[in-house]
Amino acid sequence: MNVTLFVTCLVDLFHVNVGKATVELLERLGCTIHFPEAQTCCGQPAYNSGYVKEAKEAMKHMIRTFEHAEYIVTPSGSCATMFKEYPHIFKGDGEWEARAKRVADKTYELTQFIVDVLQVEDVGARLEGKATYHTSCHMTRLLGVKDAPLTLLQHVKGLEVVPLPNAHNCCGFGGTFSVKMGPISEQMVDEKIQCIEQVEADYLIGADCGCLMNIGGRIERKGKPIRVMHIAEVLNHR
């Protein structure tokens, strides 16, 4: 099965190991990975900040880059959601609406692809300890991926997965929200960390690097002994 990897900006710039884990995991599951070097940002930051014209240029570039893929897989619910939004953004724009739909229809978040397309629930991972899972806003509310990550984590040998109180509350990242509304964002992430501490988790696992950077940065600043991991790293752990 041919998979074209949409690596995302945050993985490319700050979390290279997440990209490596994604590739190794999918290859172990029998996929052939393709990586278009021309890929850039999906346009989400510009679009959400109101720079629609500039964002559309980035989106058109990504459509041209990915439209011939068999499957498009990304280790980010947020960026997968943006690809899924392309047809709506280009609605009424003849050629580009159709091309955007072709890209959107074959785009999957990593865990969604493993469970729904590959039909795999146990990837053979092993990790000792207690973990809790942070459900990112875009992935659950917009993309609608809720069960796949937990299904995969429940099959990780040695890992006890405990529910996170107020799991669906935002961590305070929200892209540019954390910059524009710093004090509010800080309170939100502090509440998230309190919930993580409440369940005495060794690991905080998530599927979006933006959330993990926000939560992980605050955990580090507070000196808490909690390891933050992307779900791709967990599923690739042996």
Curated annotation (Swiss-Prot):
GO biological-process terms attached to the record: lactate metabolic process
Transmembrane regions: none
Disulfide bonds: none
Top-level taxon of the source organism: Bacteria
Signal sequence, renumbered to the chain: none
GO cellular component, one term: cytosol
Pfam families, per the entry: CCG
Record GO terms (molecular function): oxidoreductase activity
InterPro entries: Cys_rich_dom, LutA
Role, per record: Is involved in L-lactate degradation and allows cells to grow with lactate as the sole carbon source.
HAMAP family: LutA (MF_02105)
Family: Belongs to the LutA/YkgE family.
Protein name, UniProt field: Lactate utilization protein A
Species name: Anoxybacillus flavithermus (strain DSM 21510 / WK1)
This protein's encoding gene: lutA
